């Protein structure tokens, strides 16, 4: 599932959803900009719809227009009655303000609602946030990524940089210690590539990606990049020699071949690569290439994942792993011959880049994707090994393995002396087996088994953060081991398993909080484990360290105030790039973690431009709260417009995603579409992380298993009813919207609510029947359709009669969505047609995938969402027969009496 974004910030902010090769340099911009450049109909000069008490209510954009036609009498009579109504309205308004103000003052908090904190420092003065700013990334923090690299002689703190203006050489390796303080030695680094343009056999190459060899004597270059799926791509690969500054094709016999993956050996003497779904080995001592496999093809993949493994299991382009000593290569063999195909049509573009045969120019291009839907055959995946010295491929049979049709391999980790740790789950992801394989003896055994279905009824998410801990008797580690994330008392925590076959770990962390993508790094010399966790709050992230025996847990970041941190460590964990991502304006710094005290060595980003914008724009105020529903404590943020007046009535928009393990309520700094709605349109925006979401423990997370949509919708509706009772909320103007899983949830809420609480909804790229979505994701949370037929039926959007009771809803889908297929929306619309349900609008974007970008679509869709929402809260959708908004009385008066226009 996509659109895994988060939402939060300080008083003025909310928030926006990598493995890094050395193509990204230290101090290189890494803006994570999800928006394409372009233009929008809104500008910074767009009139701000303020909500100050001194302004006339009729100027507010969300007030409904009249739904009755004005009489056809004389203009004078019209003006007279308009003035009478205005005077009467003013008297009534004064009375209402008095009563509501008193009510607001005397209101007591609901026992089910517990406010954590109110960020009250939002900027109320200044211009509103514009949609164009949001879509073009004007509010995105400037961020940098460091490509840490291990030194060939064990040096720590080395990093790769590209194209620094104050340093010579296109690509270089620097020691972070040479940059401490203000006196940076610009000549201290080692140049790997002198010039960006590389000449090879008379051809000029502009590398897209670069990967230095571990000994830093060679660089793997990639040019002619072509995107495949979310993480995968192809290109032409070259081996660049640092000493001579010359390059040659990775495979001299096929210089124009498109390579899908290439990886250096740890000993820097060979490259394993995949081309046309087969694996090859190029030893640098020879220009010839060795074929590791020969039968790869359309349905058989070696070393790279198919679509569903790339999307839902590995979240990477590689399923190939070198052993630490470079003697073996482990890789997956993926057979998807039994997986059914789904056709994705392109009506405008031709992504293949191929000209159609004569006579077929007017037919759409069709891409057939092997896409296993829930209940259909999965790809069969097996782990194979290649002995480099013997030039031999072999499997290792292990006892108690899952059957071929019930196996998902989620992680492969090399240990020492040819040993491998393999984690696998069953098809429904609720039984985990950990195997220890010895490639020298070609034997294996089961060393751990976790029956999660019986433990808490939940599931396990694929993760790839397990760390190998080599033996070091002189440092108190007599045996090899590894650190893994396990379930402990209902929360995700770090466990240290040693020796490798020991199923009983040393718990490094415990408590009612969770580690996140952990561990981040391990300092083997000092025996310290670094990790990020939610120890202070589910909405926060702080960096911690703990010793390998589980003692002396310490925070590296300031936990006395809300914070959302991320961190990347040098190879030896002696240095780190610390990124503060909110709630205030983000910053980044290099820190030294090698001593007992953490010291700041160099601040590399303060985002001064963003800090200036925060001071000059009218930003929403964010109120973070807890909501308790049916005994579950859930996280919520309410975004209030600038100049919020509790005596007024505001429309409310609920924005949600709510996919299993996801999070939208966090303390990141983000100015996004929700911020625009609150700042510019003057609406309140509420986001609730309902049951099923992540980082609040497994009780909250696993409650939705087998029945997606039911409890999440109940939580959203229950919370909306709480808000509808608030004195500052207009209960007649409440909407909900979401994208992807959020689109599914929007329809599920409208179905369950049946017009009682929400009048409007906007669903983008929604799943409408989980039998249409991919098997790996769906069955993890729903079991198979065979095992849970009633759950699938309950989760399907079927009660269209209930949706007809909403005032109106909007459906949007990309016509070439390869993730959530347009089949979902079309079959749902057929149900609407059968019962003559007409209270909806629909829009398709040609050739757009799940992100909806093709041909200006990304700007179009957000403008459409914004305008549709304005029309909804202005009452236009009440006029089903005539959806063109009529003039309000005030507009008629302004045209009749010029003085009123000013």
Swiss-Prot record:
Protein name: Probable dipeptidyl-aminopeptidase B
Low complexity biased stretches: 7-21
Alphabetized UniProt keyword annotations: Aminopeptidase, Glycoprotein, Hydrolase, Membrane, Protease, Serine protease, Signal-anchor, Transmembrane, Transmembrane helix, Vacuole
Residues bearing carbohydrate: 335, 626, 794, 799
Region of interest (Disordered), residue spans: 1-23, 53-72
Taxon lineage: Eukaryota, Fungi, Dikarya, Ascomycota, Pezizomycotina
Sample GO molecular function, one term: aminopeptidase activity
EC number: 3.4.14.5
């Amino acid at each position: 599932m996509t659109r895994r974004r988060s939402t939060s910030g300080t008083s003025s902010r909310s928030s926006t959803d990598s493995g890094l090769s050395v193509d990204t340099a230290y101090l290189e911009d890494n803006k994570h900009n999800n928006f394409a450049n372009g233009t929008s109909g809104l500008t910074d000069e767009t009139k701000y719809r303020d909500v100050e008490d001194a302004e006339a209510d009729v100027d507010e954009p969300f007030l409904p227009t009249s739904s009755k036609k004005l009489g056809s009498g004389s203009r004078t009579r019209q003006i007279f009655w308009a003035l009478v109504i205005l005077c009467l309205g003013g008297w009534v308004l004064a009375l209402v303000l008095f009563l509501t103000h008193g009510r607001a003052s005397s209101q007591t908090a609901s026992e089910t609602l517990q406010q954590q904190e109110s960020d009250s420092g939002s900027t109320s003065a200044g211009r509103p946030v514009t949609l164009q700013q949001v879509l073009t990334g004007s509010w995105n923090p400037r961020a940098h990524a460091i490509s840490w690299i291990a030194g060939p002689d064990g040096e720590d703190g080395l990093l790769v940089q590209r194209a620094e203006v104050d340093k010579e050489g296109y690509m270089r390796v620097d020691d972070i210690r040479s940059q401490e303080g203000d006196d940076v030695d610009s000549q201290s680094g080692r140049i790997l590539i002198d010039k960006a343009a590389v000449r090879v056999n008379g051809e000029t190459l502009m590398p897209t990606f670069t990967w230095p060899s571990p000994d830093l004597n060679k660089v793997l270059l990639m040019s002619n990049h072509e995107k495949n799926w979310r993480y995968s791509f192809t290109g032409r690969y070259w081996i660049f020699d640092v000493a001579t500054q010359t390059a040659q094709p990775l495979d001299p016999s096929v210089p124009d071949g498109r390579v899908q993956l290439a990886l250096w050996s740890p000993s820097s003497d060979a490259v394993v690569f995949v081309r046309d779904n087969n694996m090859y080995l190029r030893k640098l001592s020879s220009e010839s290439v060795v074929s590791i496999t020969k039968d790869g093809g359309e349905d058989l993949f070696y070393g790279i994942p198919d679509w569903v493994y790339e999307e839902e299991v590995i979240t990477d382009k590689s399923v190939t792993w070198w052993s630490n000593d470079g003697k073996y290569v482990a890789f997956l063999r993926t057979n998807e011959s039994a997986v059914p195909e789904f056709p994705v049509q392109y009506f405008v573009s031709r992504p293949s880049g191929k000209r159609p045969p004569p006579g077929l120019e007017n037919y759409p291009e069709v891409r057939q994707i092997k896409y296993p839907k829930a209940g259909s055959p999965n790809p069969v995946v097996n782990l194979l090994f290649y002995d480099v010295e013997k030039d031999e491929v072999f499997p290792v049979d292990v006892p108690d393995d899952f059957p071929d049709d019930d196996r998902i391999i989620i992680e492969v980790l090399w240990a020492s002396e040819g040993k491998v740790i393999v984690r696998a789950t069953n098809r429904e992801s609720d039984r985990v087996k950990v195997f220890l394989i010895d490639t020298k003896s070609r034997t294996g055994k089961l060393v751990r088994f976790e029956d999660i279905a019986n433990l808490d009824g939940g599931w396990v998410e694929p993760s790839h953060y397990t760390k190998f801990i080599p033996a070091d008797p002189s440092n108190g580690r007599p045996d090899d081991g590894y650190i893994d994330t396990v379930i402990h008392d209902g929360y995700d925590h770090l466990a240290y398993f040693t020796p490798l076959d020991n199923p009983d770990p040393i718990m490094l962390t415990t408590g009612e909080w969770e580690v996140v993508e952990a561990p981040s790094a391990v300092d083997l010399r000092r025996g310290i484990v670094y990790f990020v966790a939610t120890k202070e709050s589910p909405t926060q992230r702080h960096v911690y360290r703990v010793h390998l025996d589980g003692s002396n847990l310490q925070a590296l970041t300031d936990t006395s105030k809300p914070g959302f941190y991320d961190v990347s460590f040098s190879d030896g964990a002696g240095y780190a790039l610390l990124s503060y991502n909110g709630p205030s304006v983000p910053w980044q710094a290099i820190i030294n973690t090698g001593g007992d005290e953490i010291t700041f060595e160099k601040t590399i980003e303060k985002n001064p431009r963003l800090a200036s914008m925060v001071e000059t724009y009218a930003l929403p105020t964010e109120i973070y709260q807890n909501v308790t529903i049916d005994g579950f404590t859930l996280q919520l943020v309410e975004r209030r417009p600038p100049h919020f007046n509790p005596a007024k009535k505001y429309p409310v928009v609920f924005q949600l995603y709510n996919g299993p393990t996801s999070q939208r309520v966090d303390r990141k700094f983000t100015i996004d579409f929700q911020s625009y709605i609150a700042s510019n349109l003057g609406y309140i925006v509420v986001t609730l992380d309902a049951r099923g979401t992540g980082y609040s423990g497994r009780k909250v997370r696993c409650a939705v298993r087998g029945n997606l949509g039911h409890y999440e919708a109940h939580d959203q509706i229950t919370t909306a009813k709480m808000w509808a009772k608030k004195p500052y909320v207009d209960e007649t103007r409440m909407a909900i919207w979401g994208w992807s899983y959020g689109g599914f949830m929007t329809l599920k809420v409208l179905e369950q609510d049946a017009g009682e609480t929400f009048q409007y909804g906007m669903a983008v790229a929604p799943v409408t029947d989980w039998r249409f979505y991919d098997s790996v994701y769906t069955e993890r949370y729903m079991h198979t359709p065979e095992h849970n037929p009633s759950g699938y039926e309950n989760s399907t959007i079927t009660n269209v009669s209930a949706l007809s009771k909403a005032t109106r809803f909007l459906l949007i889908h990309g016509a070439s969505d390869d993730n959530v297929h347009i089949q979902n929306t079309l079959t749902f619309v057929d149900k609407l047609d059968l019962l003559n349900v007409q209270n909806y609008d629909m829009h398709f974007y040609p050739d757009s995938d799940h992100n909806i970008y093709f041909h200006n679509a990304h700007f179009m869709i957000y403008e459409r969402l914004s305008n549709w929402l304005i029309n909804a809260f202005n009452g236009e959708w009440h006029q089903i027969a005539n959806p063109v908004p009529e003039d309000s009385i005030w507009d008629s008066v302004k045209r009749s009496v010029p003085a009123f226009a000013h």
